[in-house]
Amino acid sequence: MSPLFSKPVVPALFWQFVSTWTALTLMKLTKPVTVRLMKAGHMHSCGHDGHTTMGIAVCNWIQENLDQFCGTIKVVFQPAEEGVRGARPMTETGIFDDVDFFFGNHLGFNLPTGTISPEPGVFLASTKLDATFTGLAAHSGADPQKGKNALLAGAAAALAIHGITRPIGEVTALNVGTLVAGQGRNVVAPNAFMQLEVRGETEELNAYMRDQAIRKIKASADMYDCQVDIVKAGEATEFKPDQEAIELAYIAARNVTTEELARPLGLKLGSEDCTIMLRRVQQHGGKGTFVVFGCRTSAGHHQRLFDFDEEVIGIALRFYQNLIPMIVGIK
């Protein structure tokens, strides 16, 4: 197949995987499961083991057919997708700065197996924050007045964050996911640790939610005379795919699956830090999109009984076997 472009291009094929530190616990399961990690009590529970397998399969095929290509192909395995933590440090290495075409992917969503969509829907921009409150311990019966209660500061912040006024008619979200505090029932809590996230359909909406959350956290710490340290733990931007990349992906998809299964999905997919990589590619003149390989699942993503139809791995391989030659093929 002849290449579509007169100059060599660099398509970046992207797979993400999650190691065990972001996996879910299985310790309280009463039903047998089909997939668990070698680390006892953990599983991927989102399909990242499948993404890794897809990537390895594509790498093997590329290696076997190197004489058929005229460009450079980068296959990137991204750690720490959960919590949108892995993309930013990878983009800062410059690995995506010379990429002409970029394709990210994710499997699952309990769609009919064989579904392929380079127009999956909406990814929200998101910021993940960790807040550490520091107060002063004191005996809660003898000298409570000497303490500075970090637990109350954290609790006040959690309530205030969930009371943030939302822009009318706009898509935003927030959640305080964890709040851990204190040392004992008779000790004024000297510390508290909070994990939270905000989201918005645009960068501007996400920034509004982030700034409001930070403001509430700082004000709550001040109310209880505590100190607070706020750290950005992860981020994702909004999803803005390129039509040229979408059209290439549809051509490849329709060579693999039916016309009915190669289609826009219109899903609301939370957040995806692959968008950070895509934006970096676009800032340097490249194009890209994000492809969903739908398949049936035994439970929802991030649930303890999650498993996926492994037929999707072969479908994804055939998709890239069609896509790659369109961009860098020489025969």
Please state what every model-predicted region is:
Residues 60-65, 278-282:
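Alpha-helix C-terminal capping segments
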Residues 1-11:
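A non-catalytic alpha/beta surface segment that caps or lines the substrate-entry region
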Residues 12-14, 102, 126-128, 286-290:
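Structural motif
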Residues 152-331:
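Metal-dependent amide/peptide-bond hydrolase catalytic core
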Residues 11-31:
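N-terminal beta-rich core of secreted/periplasmic extracellular enzymes
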Residues 24-43, 49-50, 55, 67-178, ...:
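Histidine/acidic-residue-rich, glycine-tolerant segments that coordinate divalent metal ions
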Residues 2, 75, 129-131, 194, ...:
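Hydrophobic residues positioned within well-ordered beta-strands of beta-sheet architectures
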